[in-house]
């Protein structure tokens, strides 16, 4: 039997997609637009798979930028895979891991595209290729990131009214500590028991600030504190995890499956944020999830603010998890005002609903893609 081969891999920068609320303020970066990298894998049987590699703020968050992702795929990763069997994803990803250190965002996009193609070929959704889904929808949190307390409260109340979100994450850390704490506590008091409120500090506190802040936040009903201090301060993370009244979630601390094992062994976090881009793909992120489950660590489905393609690739992986205690934040497509697929993800009743159509369940809108593409 003749194998189906990878014929071509193309990386396309989808440049400056507008967002619904410029600015979107994070501790390390303020977003006005979002730039995606679309990956198209064409196979010898005529099937095309699509994937996405997206970063936050160029190089502000991680080690890869859109331009770097495209350059490395074009020059190194794609040539290594052309001519290989398209249906042997293990062999393809093993070759990439031997060829290139890191580059997890680029690898994740390629793996997602290979899974999409294989799902289309077999008539199965990607979740079935990953072992089978145990749920059909995912709770999705919304990030409040305007920096304005009254505006954030109004936005949260609107989301509750339309049954879009009932979990809210506040991006803090860039302002003085007292100002951030006042902002968060005011929002929680206004929303009360109608919503879960969480914070993401993106490593911006030192340990002395975090000791005080975690106590205040926990005492005021904040449900979760994400990455309060630097990922390199492992002993500080352990101490905070032991004394904080609110659970601590590791995000930036997990840049590989090996990081997840080390964090679990040290007892440095109560919750792991799962991100396919930082682990190297949907299959790799499931290895991190298995480490967490073995260690009794709760799980949360994170985002790199991907568009619809990256969001659905994450969603298909998260559907297969036995526990996803803290839900997800797969709201990336809702942040964008432009779409490059024909089937935008469906959000209703506080959930993202994932269809059972083959592959990721998406097709490209070629006309819209052409408006924003930069090859």
Curated annotation (Swiss-Prot):
It is an enzyme of class 5 (isomerase). Pathway: Aromatic compound metabolism; beta-ketoadipate pathway; 5-oxo-4,5-dihydro-2-furylacetate from catechol: step 2/3. Its EC number is 5.5.1.1. It catalyses: (S)-muconolactone = cis,cis-muconate + H(+). Mn(2+) binds at residues 200, 226, 251. GO terms for molecular function: chloromuconate cycloisomerase activity; manganese ion binding; muconate cycloisomerase activity. One of its GO terms (biological process) is beta-ketoadipate pathway. It comes from the Bacteria. The keyword Manganese applies. Its cofactor is Mn(2+). The active site is at 171 (proton acceptor), 329 (proton donor). Keywords: Aromatic hydrocarbons catabolism, Isomerase, Manganese, Metal-binding. SMART domains: MR_MLE. Homooctamer. Belongs to the mandelate racemase/muconate lactonizing enzyme family. This is Muconate cycloisomerase 1.
């Amino acid at each position: 039997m003749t194998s189906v081969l990878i014929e071509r891999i193309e990386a396309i920068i989808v440049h400056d997609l507008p967002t619904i609320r410029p600015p979107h303020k994070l501790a390390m970066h303020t977003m006005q637009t979002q730039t995606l990298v679309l990956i198209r894998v064409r196979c010898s049987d005529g099937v095309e798979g699509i994937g996405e590699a997206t970063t936050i703020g160029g190089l502000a968050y991680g080690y890869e930028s859109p331009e770097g992702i495209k350059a490395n795929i074009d020059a190194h990763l794609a040539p290594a895979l052309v001519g290989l069997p398209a249906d042997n994803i293990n062999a393809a990803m093993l070759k990439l891991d031997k060829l290139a250190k890191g580059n997890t965002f680029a690898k994740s996009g390629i793996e997602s595209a290979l899974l999409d193609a294989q799902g289309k070929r077999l008539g199965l959704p990607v979740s079935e290729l990953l072992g089978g889904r145990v749920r059909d929808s995912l709770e999705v949190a919304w990030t409040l990131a305007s920096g304005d307390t009254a505006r954030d409260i109004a936005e949260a109340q609107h989301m509750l009214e339309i049954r879009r979100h009932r979990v809210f994450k506040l991006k803090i850390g860039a302002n003085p500590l007292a100002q951030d704490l006042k902002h968060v506590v005011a929002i929680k008091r206004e929303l009360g028991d109608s919503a879960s409120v969480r914070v993401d500090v993106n490593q911006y506190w030192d340990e002395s600030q975090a000791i005080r802040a975690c106590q205040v936040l926990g005492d005021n009903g904040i449900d979760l504190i994400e990455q309060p201090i630097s990922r390199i301060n492992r002993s500080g993370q352990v101490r905070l995890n032991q004394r904080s009244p609110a659970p601590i979630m590791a995000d930036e601390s997990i840049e590989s499956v090996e990081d997840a094992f080390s964090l679990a062994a040290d007892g440095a976090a109560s919750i792991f944020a799962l991100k396919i881009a930082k682990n190297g793909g949907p299959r790799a992120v499931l290895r991190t999830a298995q480490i967490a489950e073995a260690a009794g660590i709760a799980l949360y489905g994170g985002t790199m603010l991907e568009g619809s393609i990256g969001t659905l690739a994450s969603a298909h992986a998260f559907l297969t998890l036995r526990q996803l205690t803290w839900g997800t934040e797969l709201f990336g497509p809702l942040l964008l005002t432009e779409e490059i697929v024909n089937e935008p993800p469906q959000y209703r009743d506080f959930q993202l609903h994932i269809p059972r159509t083959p592959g990721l369940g998406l097709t490209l809108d070629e006309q819209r893609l052409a408006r924003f593409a930069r090859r």
